[in-house]
Amino acid sequence: MATDIRAELKNCGVSAQKVRLVVDLVRGKPAVQALDLLKFTPKVAAFHVHKVLASAVANAEENFGVSRDELYIYRITADEAPTRKWRIFGARGRFKPLLRRASHITVVLRERE
């Protein structure tokens, strides 16, 4: 049975919809290739996904003694985090709701067999 190496980023300040665009680019790829791809992807979410993926690779090397060349992305998800809600008061007694969306990013790596 293969060992799962995990890393998570909670309450990332980018919406899950925007993070999923980046996550779909790297799903199933080798970890080293995915890190290179994320480094040159012009999206704000790519920075956060790169950070989590680099952390997962470091966990694999430090805690499990696995070479980074043998790792691939087994599972990567971007889920919704709690939304911060507040309002801006408008004319005639109305208000306009503001939603600040966040996301949780989870990366699971496995070793190639």
What are these regions (language model features)?
Residues 1-78, 103-113:
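Ribosome large-subunit tunnel/peptidyl-transferase-proximal elements
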